[in-house]
Amino acid sequence: TRDSVMVLMHDLTIDRTTTGKGRVADYTYEELQQFCLVDRDRNVTPYKIPRLKDLLEWGKDKVVFNFDNKYINTRGVSDEVRRASLDYYIKQLQPGGDWSMYHNIMLSVRSVEEALYYWEHGIRNVMFCVEISSMEHFRAYDASPIPWKYIMAYIRLAVNPDLQPVYDLLHAEGVMTMTSITGSSDKVKNPYDRRVAYLRELVAEPDIIETDYPSEFIGLPWSRDAIHALQEAAMRSHRTNLK
């Protein structure tokens, strides 16, 4: 905000997600409180724009927050601004920083170099969510000084059977794998078809699924035993059809 309060807001402007208009940076925190958040259908909610530190406190011991530094891969952002954004994160995470007392933060990083920048500045109280969707990615992180216990592996949009050797290596190191379906199964409009799509995602067995609709997974099988039973049923059906 204009008075240097960090708030939770997806965009640089408040137009899309609130009843107001303009850039976040043009308002003080108190001025932002005159607006309400709106849902994806533009329905006005009673909720206000929250401060980041209030959300961190609310989520302590029950939520893992994924901090995604968008300055790193945004076109037109200078190297100076990128470095400043990294240094800001480091300042907040180092002892005495506003985020340092929270141990439920995961940082999305886009390269070994970015992860190492945090690591070499002594950041040890977060997990790193990194893309590992090839054997080359695995080897790069395996050769880095960052222990695997600090790594969450983003394996892109879906489980790829051709990359099972990579997944096996990750699991052998105790690393969990995560897919993102916000641009695929989440986009299926028909509720029945979307539920079928979610079942397919579950049967593929990523460890974590990133979705915009977590509530729609309620009632779906999520335990390994239940998922394995679905896999076996699908295989039996396939064999029957072949006959």
Model segments located where?
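Asp-based phosphoryl-transfer active-site loop
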Residues: 1-2
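C-terminal active-site rim and adjoining tail of enzyme catalytic domains
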Residues: 129-243
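Metal-dependent phosphodiesterase/phospholipase catalytic core, i.e.
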Residues: 5, 10-121, 125-129, 158, ...
